[in-house]
Amino acid sequence: MPYIPQSQRQEIDPAIDQLIEQMVSLVKKQDQAERIFPGVLNYVCTRIALGVAKGVFGRMRYFLLASLAGVFSNISSELYRRVAAPYEDGKIISDGDLDEFD
């Protein structure tokens, strides 16, 4: 879950907000933002994850790799649960469900 204490959020959010602005600007400069966006997001997330892990622990070890893989898996699950599923539920209501799901 992406939840940390408010005090920690206040400490790190300004840097995250600045990074978001830079990423938005970079992607919007491109002709096909929908093509560029996934690569930029992947690059930034990977650099942050590996950079923090190496900065804290010094070198890669199995527990770090397992932890990082688990975190990215949880991010995917949480994003789907909180954002994609409600979006899809709305589309079912507006466009109709598949007959095969009945």
Each language-model region and where it sits:
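Solvent-exposed interaction surfaces and binding hotspots enriched for charged
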Residues: 1-102
